[in-house]
From Swiss-Prot:
Chain segments annotated as transmembrane: none
Protein name: Serine--tRNA ligase
Subcellular location: Cytoplasm
MF (Gene Ontology): ATP binding; serine-tRNA ligase activity
PANTHER family tied to this protein: SERINE--TRNA LIGASE, SERYL-TRNA SYNTHETASE
EC number: 6.1.1.11
Length: 426
């Protein structure tokens, strides 16, 4: 959530920054509610001052043995009036919070203005795409090595996949390799987190209320739960309602979880294969840090995700998302796009975002700087390190051979009991 003080102190700047994202801030509605909030606050403070004055008068009258019935009646009337004003204040504040909960984060000054993915500048590339002496296939056409879309549809429906045999083991190996790299080389703390979370948790990272249609929801007795669309939700909320000491920062969490997305609005996109699934595995990275460190933390986080692709020898590029392509909670985002020779193009495999204090304000996640009494909001960052299914897709397409075999990257062979290739079944 955007800082309310920033809205009150520099509304034109906020409106202009949001306009860069293509977001039309409801300025008139906001100003009306803000004026009501201020008026209620001033009225409540005035009534409280009058009550305090009457309280002193009542105390003096009682000490002198004087009749104070009239004063007490006035005090009761003021208390009733103040309660009504405070109820009005709370209702107005609730309406303000509802309005602001659907307003996206402000873009960082370094983020280029743009409309969509066509306006995203490329920052760098790594690796050279392989030259094939045959026409490489898309992964969806490599079904004989263990991709079973038919049973995915039978068991659940469209956008679900069954993996068989060595391919299923490779999928598991990829996740284990990612976890080992991030914990042993990059210093992350591995976490095992719930896949079902309550509404407050998923509100904290910004999925509610604006993106409820993208979520899977279930109910137990009178309690609502949401299936996580990413482990970012669970990992980031570990610090919700907490006041951390600066000495423990930065925190770096990693988790391997399934993720669940309805893919609302994706009809007709990536209908073949594993690129866009309702259920997929991902290794997620989360940083909790100080405002002073968050810019550098985004570069570190992105480098950690890149390291996985480098160790797997998969060509990729880094893209800086423009204002029109960023996620709701992000202030700045880098996308990693891996080369898929079967498709003949780069495809997203990771998004690494700095959310500044946007999520922290919703979660009330704070830290206390050394020597300071008053806590301040942490900064939160998240990124895929990486999407497991899309990494599998990239391996299938980049390591395919003319005879139908899929070579296993050297970095993954220790996780495959020395197996160096997957051979297609008859």
């Amino acid at each position: 959530m955007i800082d309310p003080k920033l809205l009150r102190n520099d509304l034109p700047m906020v409106v202009a920054a949001l306009a860069r994202r293509g977001f039309d801030f409801p300025e008139a509605e906001y100003q009306k509610l803000e004026d009501l909030r201020k008026a209620s606050q001033v009225k409540s403070e005035t009534l409280q001052a009058e009550r305090n004055k009457l309280s002193q008068q009542i105390g003096k009258a009682k000490s002198k043995g004087e009749d104070c019935a009239d004063l007490m009646a006035q005090a009761a009337q003021l208390e009733s009036e103040q309660a009504a004003v405070e109820a009005s204040f709370n209702e107005t504040q609730k309406q303000l919070d509802t309005l602001l909960s659907s307003v996206p984060n402000l873009p960082d000054d370094s983020v280029p203005t743009g409309k969509d993915e066509n306006d995203n500048p490329e920052i760098r590339r790594w690796g050279t795409p392989r030259t094939f002496d045959f026409t490489p296939k898309e992964h969806a056409d490599l079904m004989q090595i263990g991709l079973d879309f038919t049973n995915g549809v039978k068991l659940a429906g469209a956008r679900f996949t069954v993996l068989r045999g060595a391919l299923s083991r490779l999928h598991r190996a990829i996740a284990q390799f990612m976890l080992d790299t991030h914990t042993e080389e990059h210093g992350y703390q591995e976490m095992s987190v719930p896949y079902l979370v309550n509404p407050q948790t998923i509100y904290g990272t910004g999925q509610l209320p604006k993106f409820e249609q993208d979520l899977f929801k279930t109910r137990l007795s009178d309690r609502d739960f949401y299936l996580i669309p990413t482990a970012e939700v669970s990992l980031t909320n570990l610090v919700a309602q907490e006041i951390l000491e600066e000495s423990v920062l930065p925190l770096q969490f990693v988790a391997h979880t399934p993720c669940f997305r309805s893919e609302a609005g994706s009809a007709g996109r990536d209908v073949r294969g594993m690129i866009r699934q309702h259920q997929f595995d991902k290794v997620e990275l989360v940083h909790i840090t100080t405002p002073e460190d968050s810019h550098a933390a985004l570069e570190r986080l992105t480098a950690h995700a890149e390291r996985i692709l480098q160790k797997l020898e998969l060509p990729y590029r880094v893209i800086l998302l423009c204002t029109g392509d960023m996620g709701f909670a992000a202030r700045k985002t880098y996308d990693l796009e891996v080369w898929l020779p079967g498709q003949g193009k780069y495809r997203e495999i990771s998004s690494c975002s700095n959310c500044w204090d946007f999520q922290a304000r919703r979660m009330q996640a704070r830290f206390r700087a050394e020597g300071e009494k008053r806590p301040q909001l942490v900064h939160t960052l998240n990124g895929s390190g990486l999407a497991v299914g899309r990494t599998l897709v990239a391996i299938l397409e980049n390591y395919q051979q003319a005879d139908g075999n899929i070579l296993i990257p050297k970095a993954l062979q220790p996780y495959m009991n020395g197996l160096d290739r997957i051979t297609p079944s008859a």
